[in-house]
Amino acid sequence: MQLAPALPGVFGQEAQRQRDFFVTEVTRLAGVPLSSLKLGYQPTQLAYLAQGLASFDAHGTKKLSPATKQALNLMLASQSDDGSFRNVPCWPPLESSEYHGATVAAHALSLAPGYLSQVGQEQVDAVARLKHYLQTAEPLHDYARVLLLWAASHWDGLISDSQKRDIIKMILSHQKEDGGWSMRTFATPETWAAGVRSAKLIAEPEFKTQPSDGHQTGLVIMVLRDAGVEADHPAIQSGIRWLKSNQRVSGRWWTRSLNTDKSHFITYSGTFYPLMALQKCGELQHDHLDPPR
């Protein structure tokens, strides 16, 4: 949803179908009263839709589309007074906190070609509130700090170089001996989504060992690359080796859900993030891919 436009040679026509769905959802949400739009997870939903559409523009026409502008305007209109974007702490890590929603909104704004030069004072003020929130709110856990670094890698001046170095150091300290990273080491059971899944997480058979997973290993390598860490850095190379050694015959990389052991939907991002990580390290060969950065 966020990153597929960067791999058009992989997704082909499916990417266009995805964009059509985003546009339909934005059109639907545009008909919702603003007072209702600010409730539940809809502000973060709008941030994801806006980021997805902005990504299509950034990797495609390089121009801001009317649909993306509408999505961004709606997203900013749904913003909370403190600058965050409301979310529901029910399905971590992606539906986890207002802080998470704010980092997605920051991505959307930084990706959208020319949007910030076209906005009025209302949007300018909303962007300033978002920046202030991300600069002053304390991240809930190390997973949130990873997201902050990711957003800051595309938004100049969001955090200081010293803060970036500290987060990179933190990320490297989480690397497992096998070269991968585990999502579960980046937050305690009590801090994922206000602790709504703590009993499930503590009861997991791997609670004490917390093995590496595709979601976190792929995410971390993507973020480190976007933050300027070279692909030949020993930690990244160890992570790449883990990815190459742990893909399943089905094509996916396994990630256990933080929420349920019936449907492991996190395996979708747990497979897509590794693809992006490999691409950003020059390890994924396919026609029409954007060059690694």
Report each predicted region and the residues it spans.
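Preference for long, amphipathic alpha-helical scaffolds in soluble/luminal domains
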Residues: 1-293
